[in-house]
């Protein structure tokens, strides 16, 4: 995985609550086993009209949101089934950070495992960000090392994160990568057991 220490990007506002994994990546697109290629199907039923054209009313289809790399959403984001395809689609679409007041537990952990930083902020902070980025391009800097979210206009917030996941993201490790750091010790242990 690519290390994530600090990320600066434009926000894309999805002012909806209880966005479930079926809405993030609909079931008909779950036939792939590799982690790439899912971004084109992100929020498919909302992003596109039945004829396949972009839905002009969908938040992420607005010109200022199309280049967003930080998704700002409502509470309980990622609820529903535990499919890992949901964070795969979010990352493949181009988001590195998701900010919300709360996340479904499995989705929250799957984000870390796939190199996405899920940031829990207070509801009033998320509401303020949504107002700032609803109709215009709005840039944020998320500093994982300092655990802060800031902008040039003075917005500041802090967030909590488990030390394990923080270290994993900062170093760009997934769980296999973490294990491989101890490859020599594992080999020595295995050799001693023969």
Swiss-Prot record:
GO terms for cellular component: 3-isopropylmalate dehydratase complex. Keywords: Amino-acid biosynthesis, Branched-chain amino acid biosynthesis, Leucine biosynthesis, Lyase. GO terms for biological process: L-leucine biosynthetic process. The keyword Amino-acid biosynthesis applies. It is an enzyme of class 4 (lyase). Its EC number is 4.2.1.33. It holds the Pfam family Aconitase_C. The keyword Methyltransferase does not apply. Heterodimer of LeuC and LeuD. Catalyzes the isomerization between 2-isopropylmalate and 3-isopropylmalate, via the formation of 2-isopropylmaleate. This is 3-isopropylmalate dehydratase small subunit. It comes from Halalkalibacterium halodurans (strain ATCC BAA-125 / DSM 18197 / FERM 7344 / JCM 9153 / C-125). The gene is leuD.
């Amino acid at each position: 995985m690519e290390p994530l220490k600090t990320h600066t990007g434009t926000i894309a506002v999805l002012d909806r609550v209880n966005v479930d994994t079926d809405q993030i990546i609909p079931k008909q697109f779950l036939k792939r086993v590799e982690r790439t290629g899912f971004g084109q199907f992100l929020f498919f039923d909302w992003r596109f009209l039945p004829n396949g054209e972009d839905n002009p009313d969908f938040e992420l289809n607005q010109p200022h949101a199309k280049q967003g790399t930080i998704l700002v959403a409502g509470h309980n984001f990622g609820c529903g089934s535990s499919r890992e395809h949901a964070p795969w689609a979010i990352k493949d679409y181009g988001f590195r950070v998701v900010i919300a007041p709360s996340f479904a537990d499995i989705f929250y952990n799957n984000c870390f495992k796939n190199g996405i930083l899920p940031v829990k902020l207070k509801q009033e902070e998320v509401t303020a960000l949504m107002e700032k980025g609803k109709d215009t391009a709005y840039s944020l800097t998320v500093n994982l090392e300092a655990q802060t979210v800031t902008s040039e206009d003075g917005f500041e917030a802090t967030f909590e994160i488990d030390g394990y996941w923080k270290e994993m993201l900062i170093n760009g490790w997934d769980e296999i990568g973490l294990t491989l750091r101890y490859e020599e010790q594992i080999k020595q242990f295995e050799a001693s057991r023969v």
